[in-house]
């Protein structure tokens, strides 16, 4: 079951009353896990550009939509390689500042996964 996101503030995100003080990924089955930022940092030296390797890690077969919370000020971007990959696997991507992305997430229906950056 898809967890509801209650709130986000700089440095944290709250799901179903539980606060996480790190970036998260939400899987198709509703499982919440810590984002593997090192997959992008290894390529770009920052976690603000999502690499192809990270996009492949995030994507799950069956996901039709990916909601990305790009941070409180919206600094996270997809690399061109990551964008091309997600287009190839027919996964619609929505990049929104995290406060807006949580609203989109909570209203989302169907096969949706999420990545939420909690700073910047």
Predicted feature residues:
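Short beta-strand segments
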Residues: 27, 69, 115-119
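Compact, glycine-rich, soluble single-domain proteins
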Residues: 33-58
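Short basic, glycine-rich beta-strand/loop surfaces that mediate nucleic-acid
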Residues: 102-120
């Amino acid at each position: 079951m898809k967890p509801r996101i209650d709130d986000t503030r700089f440095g944290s995100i709250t799901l179903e009353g539980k606060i996480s003080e790190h970036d998260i990924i939400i899987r198709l089955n509703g499982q919440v896990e810590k984002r593997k930022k090192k997959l992008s940092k290894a390529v770009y030296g920052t976690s603000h550009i999502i690499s192809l390797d990270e996009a492949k890690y995030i994507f799950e077969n069956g996901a039709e939509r990916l909601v990305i919370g790009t941070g409180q000020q919206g600094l996270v971007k997809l690399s061109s390689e990551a964008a091309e990959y997600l287009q190839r696997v027919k996964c619609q991507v929505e990049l929104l500042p995290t406060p807006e992305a949580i609203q989109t997430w909570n209203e989302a229906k169907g096969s949706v996964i999420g990545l939420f950056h909690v700073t910047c």
